[in-house]
Amino acid sequence: MTDLYAEALATFATLYAEAQNSAEIEASAMTVATANLDGRPSARTVLLKAFDARGFVFYTHLDSAKGRDLQTHPQAALLFLWRSLREAGIQVRIEGGVQLVSADESDAYFASRPRMSQIGAWASLQSQTLGSREEFEAAIAKVEATFDGRDVPRPDGWGGFRVVPQAFEFWYGAKFRLHERWRYEADAASHWSKRMLYP
């Protein structure tokens, strides 16, 4: 891990901890932007579940729209917006390649989830057409009955993705739109640079 990458990661960790201790309702909420093979973009909000020097992890159905995008075009952009921080909010952008996390990591995280969240992962055919709410509730009841009295295992089609950063951008809001921006970026040889940008 290079010094500049370590610096960017430490900056994120400091801001993330600040957001977790602030008035933010859900500091871990992030927008994940993907694209399909045709280049059509898509974005949605998911929750960050872990981060370290290897990257930023979230979990989902692998056959969801984002899961399919990431398996066919393994690049993503993450966006955190913490409006309550500092003078006028902070925004962090992270861009990078994407990897599936190991089955062991996915199993460990799935086992830590509330039981009803585990059941929901089995009952939901994420991103597929649903005829009615009652149909979903019936699927939930069926899964509850199937696993009554025993642990709920992780579905084969559910797992984690790790975004491996190739760029970080930190935006510090200020009055009169006189913001401050810093960008950290890796080149093709994984050499990191840091520069200030006009707001």
From Swiss-Prot:
Molecular function terms, GO-annotated: FMN binding; pyridoxamine phosphate oxidase activity
Ligand binding (FMN): 44-49, 59-60, 66, 91, 126-127, 171, 181
Keywords (A to Z) from UniProt: Flavoprotein, FMN, Oxidoreductase, Pyridoxine biosynthesis
Lineage: superkingdom: Bacteria
EC numbers for this chain: 1.4.3.5
Class in the EC hierarchy, top level: oxidoreductase
Pfam families assigned to the protein according to its UniProt record, in alphabetical order: PNP_phzG_C, PNPOx_N
Catalytic activity, reaction form: pyridoxamine 5'-phosphate + O2 + H2O = pyridoxal 5'-phosphate + H2O2 + NH4(+); pyridoxine 5'-phosphate + O2 = pyridoxal 5'-phosphate + H2O2
Pathway: Cofactor metabolism; pyridoxal 5'-phosphate salvage; pyridoxal 5'-phosphate from pyridoxamine 5'-phosphate: step 1/1; Cofactor metabolism; pyridoxal 5'-phosphate salvage; pyridoxal 5'-phosphate from pyridoxine 5'-phosphate: step 1/1
GO biological process, one term: pyridoxine biosynthetic process
UniProt feature coiled coil, ranges: none
Entry note: cofactor: Binds 1 FMN per subunit.
Matching InterPro entries: Pyridox_Oxase (IPR000659), Pyridox_Oxase_CS (IPR019740), Pyridox_Oxase_N (IPR011576), Pyridoxamine_oxidase_dimer_C (IPR019576), Split_barrel_FMN-bd (IPR012349)
Co-factor requirement: FMN
Residues that coordinate or bind substrate: 49, 109, 113, 117, 177-179
HAMAP family: PdxH (MF_01629)
Family: Belongs to the pyridoxamine 5'-phosphate oxidase family.
Self-association and partners: Homodimer.
Described purpose of this protein according to its UniProt entry: Catalyzes the oxidation of either pyridoxine 5'-phosphate (PNP) or pyridoxamine 5'-phosphate (PMP) into pyridoxal 5'-phosphate (PLP).
Protein name according to UniProt: Pyridoxine/pyridoxamine 5'-phosphate oxidase
Organism field: Xanthomonas campestris pv. campestris (strain ATCC 33913 / DSM 3586 / NCPPB 528 / LMG 568 / P 25)
Gene, per the UniProt record: pdxH
